[in-house]
């Protein structure tokens, strides 16, 4: 998957990312998660260790912020076509929840090996689950095909400026 990523000539600059981060609407759906001191671990390593409690988010992960920021940034025309992603877990739940908040369709392509609890969580959030392939790469390829066929917006889990700014 990472091998497919290439440096694009018009990639986003650091300044553009800062601007996107400042405009991110992530707290429409996510909470500002607290830092919690890990006392025993801090003593063990001889330094202060703080845990960022992203497990307190509605989907138990920071991935919600990136997915929500991307989906919130879509024009009404693009959003009306619906969104699609490939994921075996946290990004899938983030996309499903963000799409449900925006009241748009979401298709989530997951490997057939995805734990049932993750598949059910996506379905409970309103995502249309498509099980395909034994691994992420197979699900990813299928999601791209469906995106083209249905003219849906593909929400990449990390290679998207709006997702990055949200996370």
Where are the language model's segments positioned?
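PLP-dependent amino-acid enzyme catalytic core
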Residues: 1-167
């Amino acid at each position: 998957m990472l091998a497919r990523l290439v440096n694009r000539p018009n990639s986003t600059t650091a300044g553009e990312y800062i601007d996107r981060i400042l405009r991110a609407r992530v707290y429409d759906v996510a909470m500002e998660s607290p830092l919690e001191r890990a006392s025993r671990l801090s003593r063990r390593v001889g330094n202060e260790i703080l845990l960022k409690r992203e497990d307190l988010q509605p989907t138990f992960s920071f991935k919600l912020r990136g997915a929500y920021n991307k989906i919130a940034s879509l024009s009404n025309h693009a959003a009306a076509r619906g969104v699609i992603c490939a994921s075996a877990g946290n990004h899938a739940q983030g996309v499903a929840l963000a799409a449900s908040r925006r009241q748009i369709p979401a298709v989530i392509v997951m490997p057939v090996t995805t734990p049932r609890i993750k598949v059910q969580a996506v379905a409970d959030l309103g995502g249309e689950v498509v099980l395909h392939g034994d691994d992420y790469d197979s699900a990813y390829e299928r999601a791209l095909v469906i995106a083209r066929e249905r003219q849906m917006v593909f929400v990449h889990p990390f290679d998207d400026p709006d997702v990055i700014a949200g996370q």
